[in-house]
Amino acid sequence: MKSALLKQHFLNPVGMKRIDSPSYRATCRSDTCSDVIRMTVTVDGDGVVRDIGTEVYGCGYSIAGASLFNSAALGIPVEDVAAIVDRQLAAVLPEVPEGNRRCVELPKKAFSTIYESYRSEKNR
């Protein structure tokens, strides 16, 4: 891995776990390889991500991307997670081989399902 940040997240991943009683959960499979991510998130009454866990069945780039995502999302309002993660991804994606970029972005795809569930529940 060329990115020092992604390498750090791969070697010392953050949030690689399953939350037993999450507020939301999503499973996402890559459309280009066999990587799978299962994400569980606990959101408090104010809409803040209080805990996030990700199980990754895939390559090192998926693991690093999930760890980066988890560390960026923790303690952030659900509504703001995508923008914050986008800024972090923009900084590292140029150093990721073209064929692995979707692996790094896979956690964001899983979180989009969680976000839609959150918005749907909030608008009831």
Where are these regions (language model features)?
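Domain-level signature for proteins that mediate thiol-based redox and metal-cofactor handling
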Residues: 1-124
